[in-house]
């Protein structure tokens, strides 16, 4: 790709080194060609590690892989929100794309509510690209990849993975497969809800305070599990100070993988490994220090923009 080999690009990204614009264009194009053949809901076998929001925290993403013994030996599902708020959204997303090309059967990338043109223009990713490249071309290339990301995954036919949650317009996983995903995320409807909805202690569907998606409760989760003959919904989308949170008698779990979110929240992060017997094993990890052993800044001192809600 523009004179750079894939493994060389990976090494550059791990150290947040500059990648030529032409190389990023070719990388994004190759990823689209790969992702277009994937279903809206990707089938994944165990063992697999489920990862929540990353939000541009590159160094913590590298820690995540280290704690999980690396992508060379394991499968991973990332539940979206790769970009915005952190300082290294571009490097984080491109690194995951490189891994997708390098190990296509070992990594599944699901779209989050931040993988849209509208959201990234407001919450950091667009401005980051302008700052690093002086124009919006790289942002546009990445946004085109967003449109090809899957909306969910099914692990061993038993665990449904999604970024946000459920939708009153979708009763079965098969209905999700019929959605036209190759578009900007709509402001309402099933595709929007899957990326924006949240679980809560409510009796029935309620409008979300986020302004998009719905709140759903135990009844909706139990019905979805029963109707689809599955045992668990794994999702991300909400900060959890302890890294993960199980709800509704273990029928739903929120996984959060961005420690010390926005470099100030003080939370730990988690990933969830699902073994062949469908047992759940959580790994908790903390954020990388702000400085290395020599006192050099790893994380810039300027804080990213804080916005609509954590």
From Swiss-Prot:
It is an enzyme of class 3 (hydrolase). Its EC number is 3.1.3.16. The modification Leucine methyl ester is found at residue 310. One of its GO terms (biological process) is negative regulation of DNA damage checkpoint. It catalyses: O-phospho-L-seryl-[protein] + H2O = L-seryl-[protein] + phosphate; O-phospho-L-threonyl-[protein] + H2O = L-threonyl-[protein] + phosphate. Keywords: Cytoplasm, Hydrolase, Manganese, Metal-binding, Methylation, Nucleus, Protein phosphatase. The keyword Hydrolase applies. Its cofactor is Mn(2+). The keyword Oxidoreductase does not apply. It comes from the Eukaryota. It is found in: Cytoplasm; Nucleus. CDD domains: MPP_PP2A_PP4_PP6. Gene3D superfamilies: 3.60.21.10. Mn(2+) 2 binds at residues 81, 113, 163, 237. Mn(2+) 1 binds at residues 53, 55, 81. Binds 2 manganese ions per subunit. The active site is at 114 (proton donor). Its main location: cytoplasm. Catalytic subunit of the histone H2A phosphatase complex (HTP-C) containing PPH3, PSY2 and PSY4. Belongs to the PPP phosphatase family. PP-4 (PP-X) subfamily. This is Serine/threonine-protein phosphatase 4 catalytic subunit.
């Amino acid at each position: 790709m523009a004179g750079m080999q894939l493994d060389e690009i990976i090494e550059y990204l791990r150290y947040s080194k500059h990648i030529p614009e032409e190389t990023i264009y070719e990388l994004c194009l190759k990823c689209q060609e790969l992702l277009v053949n994937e279903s809206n809901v990707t089938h994944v076998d165990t063992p697999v590690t489920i990862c929540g929001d990353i939000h541009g925290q590159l160094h913590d993403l590298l820690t995540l892989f280290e704690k999980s013994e690396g992508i060379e030996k394991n499968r991973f599902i990332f539940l979206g929100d790769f970009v915005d708020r952190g300082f290294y959204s571009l490097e984080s997303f491109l690194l995951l794309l490189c891994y997708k090309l390098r190990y296509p059967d070992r990594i599944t990338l699901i779209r989050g509510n931040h993988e849209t043109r509208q959201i990234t223009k407001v919450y950091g990713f667009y401005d980051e690209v302008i700052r690093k490249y002086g124009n919006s071309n790289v942002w546009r290339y990445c946004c085109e990849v967003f449109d090809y990301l899957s909306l969910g995954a099914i692990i061993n036919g038993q665990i449904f993975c999604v970024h946000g949650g459920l939708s009153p317009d979708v009763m079965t996983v098969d209905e999700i497969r019929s959605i036209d995903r190759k578009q900007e995320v709509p402001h309402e409807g099933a595709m929007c809800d899957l990326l924006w909805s949240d679980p809560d202690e409510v009796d029935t569907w309620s409008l979300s305070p986020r302004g998009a998606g719905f709140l759903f409760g135990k009844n909706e989760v139990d019905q979805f599990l029963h109707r689809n003959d599955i045992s668990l919904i794994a999702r991300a989308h909400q900060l959890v100070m302890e890294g993960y949170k199980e709800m509704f008698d273990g029928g739903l779990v929120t996984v959060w993988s961005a420690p010390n979110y926005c470099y100030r929240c003080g939370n730990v992060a988690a990933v969830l490994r699902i073994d062949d017997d469908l047992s759940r094993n959580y790994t908790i990890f903390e954020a990388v220090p702000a400085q290395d052993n020599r006192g050099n800044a790893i994380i810039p001192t300027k804080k990213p923009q804080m916005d609509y809600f954590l």
